Amino acid sequence: METQNAKAIARKISIAPRKARLVVDLIRGKNIAQAQAILTFTPKVAAPVILKLLNSAVSNAVNNLKLNREQLYVKEVFVNEGLRLKRMFPRAKGSGDMIKKRTSHITLVITSSTNLQTSKEEEQSGSKN
């Protein structure tokens, strides 16, 4: 049986990937209720954005794939680097420095824990031959 995954992607988020990865690492592998609680009380700029993305992925799973909300967990979540917007910062004597405003692409995949159990059972039954 193929596992059903629900996915949500946020692109061109104006948060540096390094800062977004700090928040993303907190919720990897957690169930949805735990992840929402963690994100609600995390005092980082990326936390509300990732919470909104998590809620979007949950809605995709419940409405499109008809999965049970209580059995969902974060299967994988990662942050890729987006565009770098180059801006000038004025310095002394008419010179300037380049500032790179970094953006992020955040991908979140959730799946049902029943899918995980059935795939483990299939692997175990297949290895006993």
From Swiss-Prot:
* Similarity comment: Belongs to the universal ribosomal protein uL22 family.
PANTHER family listed in its UniProt record: CHLOROPLAST 50S RIBOSOMAL PROTEIN L22-RELATED, LARGE RIBOSOMAL SUBUNIT PROTEIN UL22M
One function term, GO molecular function aspect: structural constituent of ribosome
**From what superkingdom does this record's organism come?**
Bacteria
Designated name of the protein = Large ribosomal subunit protein uL22
Against Pfam families, the record matches this protein to: Ribosomal_L22
Q: Which InterPro entries match?
A: Ribosomal_uL22 (IPR001063), Ribosomal_uL22_bac/chlpt-type (IPR005727), Ribosomal_uL22_bac/org-type (IPR047867), Ribosomal_uL22_CS (IPR018260), Ribosomal_uL22_sf (IPR036394)
What processes does the entry annotate via GO biological process terms?
A: translation
Q: Which GO terms describe its cellular component?
A: cytosolic large ribosomal subunit
The species this protein was found in: Onion yellows phytoplasma (strain OY-M)
For this UniProt record, give its keywords in alphabetical order, as a comma-separated list: Ribonucleoprotein, Ribosomal protein, RNA-binding, rRNA-binding
Task: State the oligomer form and interacting partners.
Answer: Part of the 50S ribosomal subunit.
Q: What does this protein do?
A: This protein binds specifically to 23S rRNA; its binding is stimulated by other ribosomal proteins, e.g. L4, L17, and L20. It is important during the early stages of 50S assembly. It makes multiple contacts with different domains of the 23S rRNA in the assembled 50S subunit and ribosome. The globular domain of the protein is located near the polypeptide exit tunnel on the outside of the subunit, while an extended beta-hairpin is found that lines the wall of the exit tunnel in the center of the 70S ribosome.
